[in-house]
Amino acid sequence: MSGAVFGEQMLGRDAFYALLAREGLKLKRPKPRHTTNSNHRFHKWKNLVKGYVPYGPNLLWVSDITYIQLASGNCCYLHLVTDAYSRKVIGWCLSHTLEAKYTIEALRMAIKQAEGADLSRLIHHSDRGVQYCCNAYVEELHNIGASISMTEDYKPTDNGIAERINGIIKTEKLYRQPLYGSFEEASIGIDEFIRFYNDRRPHMSIGFQTPSEVHRQCGPQQRQWQGYQQTSSP
């Protein structure tokens, strides 16, 4: 049928790719960017949040790191801490590298926004990356009395809320615009989007309220992500 429409000289897919390769026109496949290095000597903590649904803010924080491509071909890294109850981004840091000091900076922002609240019932959940397992990060969590929880394998659903926030930032902001021209431009743009996300963007999983609205509440919300099925008791 395609021959009848486009003519007998139409190339098939494989022949077309071979022609591109022969003429040097194929683009190089970009190297994958990895933000998680779980091959390290530090202790890896058990997953404490299977079936757990927080009933208020500052009971479950989820953390993750994602990368942002720049127009120069380089990238920068966005370290995020999100409250799982309200879906509010409560801590973030944009950095040139994956050093743990930037992950700690995002955590300290989250602690500061809690404004002295009792965090002794807080669970901090993340992947098993070295940034979250290193002594300095663990010490920050121990200092506030938080429990530490980590994913047990590499399934994105094990840190689903954090992965969802990454996806929202990329699909609703980064993929709809040209690449940022500089680190400084990226920092301004991310700051603006996080403010918009927290204060103005209704969220399906919290009854079309904004994260900032829900962060001032407690009690069950209308919808929850799959994987957090059981409400915690006060």
Predicted regions, residues:
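Basic, flexible linker segments flanking DNA-binding modules
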Residues: 1-57, 155, 210-219
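C-terminal domain-tail junction helix/linker
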Residues: 142-146, 168-234
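RNase H-like two-metal-ion nuclease catalytic core shared by retroviral integrases
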Residues: 36-40, 126-128, 134-138, 150-171, ...
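Short small-residue beta-strand/loop micro-motif enriched in glycine and branched aliphatics
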Residues: 88-92, 149-151, 175-177
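An active-site-proximal beta-strand-loop segment
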Residues: 54-90, 96
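Short helix-terminating capping/connector loops at secondary-structure junctions
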Residues: 9, 117-120
